[in-house]
A protein has these predicted regions:
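Glycine-rich phosphate/diphosphate-binding loops that line cofactor/substrate pockets in enzymes
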Residues: 123-136
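Long amphipathic alpha-helical segments
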Residues: 45, 49-75, 86
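NAD(P)-binding Rossmann-fold cofactor-contacting core
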Residues: 137, 144-174
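Conserved Rossmann-fold dehydrogenase catalytic segment
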Residues: 10, 14-38, 63-83, 101-112
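Anion (oxyanion) recognition and catalysis
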Residues: 53, 97, 163
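Active-site glycine- and acidic-residue-rich loops that bind
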Residues: 111-121, 148-149
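Active-site-proximal catalytic alpha-helix in oxidoreductases
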Residues: 23-52, 82-95, 114, 153
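Single conserved hydrophobic/aromatic residue that forms the stacking wall/gate
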Residues: 1-8, 12-13
Length: 174
């Protein structure tokens, strides 16, 4: 209610109407659902990207074509970091475990996304060896574009993995 009063019942945020939840518990659970859904969809994109790579198919082109269907959730493969998505997923899994419930899909998605940093680092390392590079520049360090926030960034995992292979690694985040 307070939020609705502050922004006004007719107010829109990013061209969407403000939705008034019946309780803070509903609002927080809805936000968690949104973040967990994104985690699961990115895991699907990551797995599908691996499949496409094995088939010699460009995942970005596949995604663009699939997005021509109105109800396709356009999500690209990548690292999942930050202070919301993975954190909310782990919180949900802990709450479910406390209630003796299993969330197999969510757990699998989290496992897939946690493994992605190592896969990215391996691809970079293999390419560095192929071109005989001793120095790597990682462009972008925060967990998403246009933010200085580096909390739980998975680029740090990529950086650390590359350093273990004795490569000189620099980072720049424009």
């Amino acid at each position: 209610e307070i939020s609705a009063c502050l922004v006004g019942s007719e107010m829109c945020i990013r061209d969407r109407p403000v939705i008034e939840a019946s309780s803070i518990k509903i609002a927080e659970t809805a936000k968690m659902y949104e973040n967990v859904q994104r985690d699961v969809l990115i895991a699907l994109a990551n797995e599908y990207a691996d499949f496409c790579k094995s088939e010699g198919i460009n995942i970005n082109e596949v995604t663009e074509c699939a997005a021509s269907k109105w109800n396709f959730a356009k999500v690209y493969p990548g690292l999942v970091g930050g202070h919301c998505i993975g954190v909310d997923t782990y919180y949900l899994m802990k709450r479910a475990k406390d209630k003796k419930q299993s969330l197999n899909l969510v757990q699998t998605a989290r496992h897939i996304n946690e493994a992605e940093s190592k896969k990215v680092a391996t691809r970079i390392k293999d390419y560095a060896v192929f071109i005989n590079a001793q120095r790597i520049l990682l462009l972008g360090f925060s967990y998403k574009a246009n933010t200085p926030d580096c909390r739980n960034t998975k680029v740090a995992d990529v950086y650390n993995e590359l350093k273990q292979h004795c490569l000189v690694v620099d980072c720049f985040d424009p």
